[in-house]
Regions:
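Small, basic N-terminal interaction modules of short regulatory proteins
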Residues: 3-4, 14, 94, 106
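Compact nucleic-acid interaction/catalytic patches
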Residues: 6-50
Length: 106
């Protein structure tokens, strides 16, 4: 399951860590997608909430992905569900306008 951790960005906020676990041990930076309570209704957002360790309903914003030093990551607060992992993959394809077939596209 993909981790949701606190990170120091513009302020301390939850993020989904996108860098795969095996690579993290060798990296000084990781790529993360910030989580915000300001949903814009975009296809590049993934809904998350209390079931993921958050205080309130929010979205993972794949339009605002950043790479940060590992030492800006804080504690783990939760994880994405299997369904949210699928939505995350779909949101990445849509956010970056990748030419890949989408499963269950609607």
């Amino acid at each position: 399951m993909r981790e949701i951790r606190l990170a120091r960005l513009d302020k301390t906020r939850p993020v989904v860590v996108l860098t795969r676990d095996p690579a993290r041990a060798a990296m000084t930076k990781v790529t993360v997608a910030p989580i915000t309570s300001t949903a814009k209704g975009l296809c590049s957002e993934v809904p998350v909430g209390v079931e993921n360790g958050l205080d309130h309903p929010s979205v993972v914003s794949l339009d605002n992905v950043v790479t940060i030093p590992v030492d800006l990551l804080g504690r783990t607060i939760g994880f994405l569900t299997a369904e949210q992992e699928s939505l995350l993959a779909r949101a990445v394809v849509l956010a970056y306008d990748l030419d890949l077939p989408l499963m269950n596209a609607s």
